[in-house]
């Protein structure tokens, strides 16, 4: 059948995940905070002392297609100039809140001129303020399929371009069509702060653009105790993840402080201890709002893991400070239970409030994971046979 599959028929091979964040606080009075959206509540049923405030990071997972990685050495030519863009659009809110799991969706309806052969390819270029993986450790895009038959394999090139290379399905076929729906996630490295951004996708010089404002959450500040965090990387193939926590980003002096990080959903009780690194932030005013931190930058981060009172057990860590008087970043690398329904990591800072004398309080920040799915489908028709040649009519004899 040459019918175009619906998106519900598309395989779940290109799944996208977002990491959600919620805050919990002991306060003198109840704070007004936003309610989580439906997608976030799918990931975490958190009983917070006050209404939850949520953020989300994003993850894309696809089944590995080993042929894709080795596919760039085959023959074929760029057929981007054979593409007609029937429709293109970047669907998005005008304001994107990445920490709430919000993303854009690039949609293309394409047709291809005749003469496309196996091995030929076309490229989609994206502006560097977005990526297709979210917090996934592996970059993948979906195959274009007609039913279960692969029309083209997708791969991510080193420069970030998306390349689709056609299979033998297209040989001797015409009327080739493709429909793509790809999630685009704000890149926390290239967009470190709240800002106006133009998201642009390009095929053969033809641009599709959406202008948005990127707005990050600033974590939780409860009577001077402040925490922020994000799940920054997740690998579903080996069930590992990386979490970053900002401790005391507002840079107050907090006596008798304790930091506690814990996997509260999805902990894998396998006896393996997580890897925990603690960094003192040397330039607190330059911390990224996006909760992206290159901890290898020694001009910004000083590794103090061996200089503090750190205790690490299965699925959690605890840091005790007599006086917390600097900003810290905690990097937490761990396995998780791949069979769990959700993954949630909680960071809590407790101590004496710098606002109120002898007032003990705490602030918690939860990060979870949500999944999105990319879709791609297509079709092509067998060429119609040339009509049987009609014989020339018998010549009529000349009149006598």
Residue ranges, per PLM feature:
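Intrinsic-disorder/low-complexity, polar/charged segments enriched in Ser/Thr/Lys/Arg/Asp/Glu/Gln
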Residues: 103-107, 121, 161, 179, ...
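Acidic, proline-/serine-/threonine-rich low-complexity intrinsically disordered repeat tracts
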Residues: 7-9, 13-44, 48, 53, ...
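Hydrophilic extracytoplasmic domains
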Residues: 288-397
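Low-complexity, intrinsically disordered segments enriched in Ser/Thr together with acidic residues
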Residues: 164-206, 313-353
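Short, hydrophobic/aromatic beta-strand segments
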Residues: 117-124, 133-137, 254-260
